[in-house]
């Protein structure tokens, strides 16, 4: 018998989310960021629902090639660029724009034999200090790239570390303006948070990611609750066991939760091997038979326990929503000390996925 845990992907919600996000930046073109296999939703499964985007921004060649083979003919941007010089031949074959953030990549472009120039996204380090050239170096690097016959259209790109904060882009924007002074070029700066909350950063291309999937870039659902955005992924299971416990009984590994009164406990077929966070504490929200309740005790590999006190009608086979339309993934993540991004990406391969 198949375990009842399943993830469903709502493609209509995904299409509608794209429309909402596009309206937030009406003057910009839009990269749909689909890194890490579309935030765990599956690139092959969801790309057609995002085909109204102007392009897809991905992390690796395998996903880019998959999109091409699935029929996408528009732009595909490699956000971290190419990792080895010999990959440039593949970028050339599939016509993939690439970010450039290191000196060795410039040298590789100089030496490559390509059929046609590649469009380049020059990465500026505006303060996150991961990838990119410091602002004071950008003019020099720009001129180096402009002199390479393998380089086509160039765009300045950067990434904000704190765009969820009202003042979080002030200093990065100053650095970007410093880098761009005197350069007549397109820019791509805005991630999900900046797309929603910082129109001054929209420029030519925005790059929304997590918001397309109905979760908040700030990690707080209330920050996007009034936007119309809807969760795309729902993780469901069922009650597979019920325990009627006396006061003082321990639940789960380590006995972290003990009953203080007679309590009815439901056992759900879902655990950390399915992608549910092991660190989720007692009190993490969950929906059982349409009623909001909480987890109790430590999450096991294949199971977790829930309090059935608010839903006395629930028994074996009662439906459980771990996250989705009613139980927001941001709330589960916040309870677990993490972010919705991580939970989406951690969905285990053993969990069946259906599309709606």
Swiss-Prot record:
It catalyses: L-alanine = D-alanine. InterPro entries: Ala_racemase, Ala_racemase/Decarboxylase_C, Ala_racemase_C, Ala_racemase_N, Ala_racemase_pyridoxalP-BS, PLP-binding_barrel. SMART domains: Ala_racemase_C. It holds the Pfam family Ala_racemase_N. Keywords: Isomerase, Pyridoxal phosphate. The keyword Isomerase applies. One of its GO terms (molecular function) is alanine racemase activity. The modification N6-(pyridoxal phosphate)lysine is found at residue 35. Its EC number is 5.1.1.1. Belongs to the alanine racemase family. Its cofactor is pyridoxal 5'-phosphate. The keyword Isomerase applies. The active site is at 35 (proton acceptor), 253 (proton acceptor). PROSITE patterns: ALANINE_RACEMASE. GO terms for cellular component: cytosol. CDD domains: PLPDE_III_AR_proteobact. HAMAP family: Ala_racemase. Substrate binds at residues 130, 301. One of its GO terms (biological process) is D-alanine biosynthetic process. This is Alanine racemase, catabolic. NCBIfam families: alr, PRK03646.1. Isomerizes L-alanine to D-alanine which is then oxidized to pyruvate by DadA. It is an enzyme of class 5 (isomerase).
């Amino acid at each position: 018998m198949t375990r009842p845990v399943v993830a469903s992907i709502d493609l209509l919600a995904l299409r509608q989310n794209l429309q909402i996000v596009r309206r937030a930046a009406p003057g910009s073109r839009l990269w749909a960021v689909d890194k890490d296999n579309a935030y765990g939703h599956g690139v092959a499964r969801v790309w057609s629902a995002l085909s109204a985007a102007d392009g897809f921004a991905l992390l690796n060649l395998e996903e880019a090639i998959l999109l091409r083979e699935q029929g996408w003919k528009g732009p595909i941007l490699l956000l971290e660029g190419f990792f080895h010089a010999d990959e440039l031949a593949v970028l050339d074959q599939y016509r993939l724009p690439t970010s450039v953030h290191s000196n060795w990549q410039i040298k590789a472009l100089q030496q490559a034999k390509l059929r046609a120039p590649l469009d380049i996204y020059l990465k500026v380090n505006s303060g996150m200090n991961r990838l990119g050239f410091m602002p004071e170096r950008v003019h020099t690097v720009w001129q180096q790239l402009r002199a390479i016959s393998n380089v086509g259209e160039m765009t300045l790109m950067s990434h904000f570390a704190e765009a969820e904060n009202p003042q979080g882009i002030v200093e990065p924007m100053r650095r970007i303006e410093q880098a761009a002074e005197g350069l007549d070029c397109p820019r791509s700066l805005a991630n999900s948070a900046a797309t929603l909350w910082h129109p001054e950063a929209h420029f030519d291309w925005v790059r929304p990611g997590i918001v397309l999937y109905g979760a908040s870039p700030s990690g707080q659902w209330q920050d996007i609750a009034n936007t119309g955005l809807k969760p795309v992924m729902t993780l469901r299971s069922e009650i597979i066991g019920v325990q009627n416990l006396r006061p003082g009984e321990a639940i789960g590994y380590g006995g972290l939760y003990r009953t203080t009164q007679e309590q009815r406990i439901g056992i759900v077929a879902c655990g950390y091997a399915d992608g549910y966070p092991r660190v989720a504490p007692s009190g993490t929200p969950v929906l059982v038979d349409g009623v909001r309740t909480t987890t109790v005790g430590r999450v096991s590999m294949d199971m977790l326990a829930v309090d059935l006190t608010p839903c006395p009608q629930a028994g074996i086979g009662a439906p459980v929503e771990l996250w989705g339309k009613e139980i927001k993934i941001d709330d589960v993540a916040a309870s677990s000390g993490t972010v919705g991004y991580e939970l989406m990406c951690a969905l285990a391969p053993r969990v069946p996925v259906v599309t709606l």
